[in-house]
Amino acid sequence: MARLCRRVPCALLLGLAAVLLKARLVPAAARAELSRSDLSLIQQQQQQQQQQQLQEQKQREEAEEGRPEVPGASSTLVAPVSVFMLKVQVNDIVSRQYLSQAVVEVFVNYSKTNSTVTRSNGAVLIKVPYQLGLSLTIVAYKDGYVLTSLPWKTGRMPIYSSVTLSLFPQSQANIWLFEDTVLITGKLADAKSQPSVQFSKAFIKLPDNHHISNVTGYLTVLHQFLKVDSFLPATGVTYKSGLENVELTPHAAICVKIYSGGKELKVDGSIHVSLPLLHTSNIKIGDRIPAWTFDMNAGVWVHHGWGTVKEHNSHLIWTYDAPHLGYWIAAPSPATLDFGINDDFQDITAYHTVFLTAILGGTIVIIIGFFAILLCYCRGKCATPQKRERNITKLEILKRDQTTSTTHINHISSVKTALKAEDKPQLFNAKTSSYSPQRKETTKTEAEERISMVKTRDNFKIYNEDVSFLSVNHNYSRNPTQSLEPSMGSKQPKHINNNLSPSLGDAQEEKRYLTGTEEVYGRSHIPEQLMHIYSQPIAILQTSDLFSMPEQLHAAKSATLPRKGQLVYGQLMEPVNRENFTQTLPKMPMHSHVQAPDAREEDIVLEGQQSLPSQTSDWSRYSNSLLESVSVPGTLNEAVVMTPFSSELQGISEQTLLELSKGKPPHPRAWFVSLDGKPVAQVRHSFIDLKKGKRTQSNDTSLDSGVDMNEHQSSRKLEREKTFIKSMHQPKILYLEDLDLSSSESGTTVCSPEDPALRHILEGGSGVIIEHPGEESPGRKSTVEDFEANTSPTKKRGRPPPLAKRDSKTNIWKKREERPLIPLN
């Protein structure tokens, strides 16, 4: 027991000691922990304060960035700001009473620094922070009064300042409520034109439990104060280059507000404002005056659009569409006037630039067109003398057809009927060229052209005659004074060339007349007879395989060989009398007006033939220009000159020849068809040598056909195979009449209606052919003389008197009887 007692107190003592030790250790640790937490808290607080300062600084910077920059203003007041005392007294401009509870605000550098209200005496004392060089504006306003602003600026720092602001009382306006619009008008008794404000009824937003009848409108016009210059000056701000102060001189001012239940209603939208203007000399109708409104945040007048000056009831008014109700003034300023003038000037300049450009362009176009027309005219004038239009040529092509042994004269087919005066001298001025299928002649010298020209004139005399048909008791006689017109059958007297050989004296006189005429008119020596064709006999070569087709045989009749009946070239066939046994083509109507004085030149006998008798024919001249193996008159095939009858003549001539030569075996070389149908070997003809002493050379040719008997056949075989017959589709009725078949040294057969050979051919049908007498009947002579007497002087213009006498005295049939036909067997 004693041992147990000893152990308990020791354990208790050890426990107490441990507890005490533990108690000492815990507060020390706690105190250590508390000391460490306080430091961290302080640090955290400091960090939070720094962050708050940074955030505030950022906010201030953002707020300053949002404000407009003003020259001389700084974002932060770096320098120490001076403060001075400012006393503001507010009163009524009409009653001069002090206004209590009026709001007074101070703006320094377009920022609000102070805002307070007046006391009962209408005064208030304000501490204003100010720095030299900054703008300062004091604004006072009160319900029922128009806002008044006072811009102020000083060059020295004041200690104390006192100012008085007079407020304009608002005038109650007349308000008119319509279903869709609201009209507010003024109450000016002495004004000719009342101010008015009109806007849509939908723009009014009434509070709850408010009716439209509780709305009250106020419209105040300050022009009565402007008359006495009692309106305070205003300062405007433009944004031309940042913020710039502009001194304003208002011409009109209006304040419009709407109240409902004592509270102002805000109206935003398109509001039409019409305000009368003062009579000033510098305002005209159509001028644009800028509109200004007061900004309550910056304390300055701000430009907001343009108004237009108009005339109403003989008074000038300023009209403007405002974005909201409030306080508006119309005041021009130098800066805004410059803007307006510049804009107007730019508009006017642009308008006039377009207008002047259009005028200048039109003028340039007109000038260019004028010069172009002038250039074309001058070019045409200069080029006219150089033009050589070949309307009609002197036998352009002289072509020999070896197949038919005929001479084709290819002319330019189109001959103009109307010619210009300057082109007439060129009508007969052309070159002559001849070619054959085997060869073409090269260019000739000028001397050779003259020789060819003379030969052409001498060798190609074409006998033409105007023919009309007079039917008296079935007897047809030739009337040389009438011509058959192919168009309407109208008969017109024309000049007649009877191809009578003149005497030596008459020829010399006529030659002198024609030479003088050629010198006057500048005509060439191409005779008019080349344009008028007279049917004559022709020699045609026939090949066995050429006329095999029946339609070709029908259209290949001769145009010169006489036969009875009427010949119709086309689908139309009519019965005719057998007295119409010959065919003669009338003179071309298109050439009837081209009769020049040189048309009678072919009747003149050249030097070697002037001493020969007048009965001698001129067919011998064909032999001078034809080739060696052909000396056949080519008058028929020269009819290609006459475009309307060219193809008919060729086809008719060949068809007649084929009919006459039917049933006979083809000759190995060629056939010559005479008037009595005899072959070449049995036909002979006596001829008169017109050039007895001057002709030294002659070709060994047949007197009848003109074919060179010594010429080889090889050169002509191919040409025969190439021959074709050209036919026309238009029906042409050609009447047969006796022909002037003259003989010459070329060997052509001469026949007349009195010849027995012609009578033998024409007796194929029944009836009796009435023979023409050798001498002309007196009735015929009288008819000719009467017609020549009645011929108009216009048709006889240019005819020499000797030729007229010779034509009236000479008879063609008499000449034919003087040429005897002697058959040589």
Swiss-Prot record:
Tissue-specific expression: Expressed in the brain, predominantly in the thalamus, in the hippocampal formation (in CA1, CA2 and CA3 regions and in the dentate gyrus), in the cerebellum (in Purkinje and granule cell layers, as well as neurons of the deep cerebellar nuclei) and cerebral cortex (at protein level). Expressed predominantly in neurons.
Chain intervals with Basic and acidic residues compositional bias: 57-68, 772-784, 804-825
Glycan attachment residues as annotated in the record: N109, N114, N214
Domain of life the protein comes from: Eukaryota
Family annotation (InterPro entries): FAM171, FAM171_C, FAM171_N
Entries under Pfam families matching the protein: FAM171A1-2-B_C (PF20771), FAM171A1-2-B_N (PF10577)
Residues annotated as transmembrane: 354-374
Keyword field: Glycoprotein, Membrane, Phosphoprotein, Signal, Transmembrane, Transmembrane helix
Membrane topology (UniProt): Single-pass type I membrane protein
Localisation: Cytoplasmic granule; Membrane
Region Disordered, annotated ranges: 52-74, 693-717, 770-825
Cytoplasmic side: 375-825
Record protein name field: Protein FAM171B
Organism name: Mus musculus (Mouse)
Taxonomic lineage from the root: Eukaryota, Metazoa, Chordata, Craniata, Vertebrata
Gene for this chain: Fam171b
